[in-house]
Design a protein with these regions (language model features):
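Amphipathic alpha-helical interaction segments
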Residues: 19-20, 48-49, 80
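Core segments of cupin and vicinal oxygen chelate
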Residues: 1-40
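Vicinal oxygen chelate
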Residues: 3-6, 61-83
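Long, continuous compositionally biased terminal/linker segments
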Residues: 34-71
Length: 83
């Protein structure tokens, strides 16, 4: 989850395009990205409590090439991520 949905939305709008993904579904406080179907969601917590670190969580994305990984990384840095 995220505690700042508008900021998270702007970040993922910028970086998911580097993997060829687009917005597939969106709801108030939630958005799903993918190529043909939802592959990745980001949303504000539905229980109204603050988002927290998910112990043991893992997030991965499909990429077609190292060049696409590099483009995703560059887009993430440009959108405010840190190395």
């Amino acid at each position: 989850g995220t505690n700042d949905f508008p900021r998270a939305r702007a970040f993922y709008d910028a970086v998911m395009a580097a993997l060829g993904c687009k917005v597939i579904l969106e709801y108030p406080g939630a958005v799903a990205y993918g190529k043909l179907y939802p592959e990745f969601w980001v949303q504000a917590p539905i229980d109204g409590r603050p988002a927290s670190v998910g112990n043991g969580s893992h997030v991965g994305f499909f990429a077609d090439s190292k060049a696409q990984v590099d483009a995703f990384h560059a887009a993430a840095l440009a959108a405010g991520a840190r190395d």
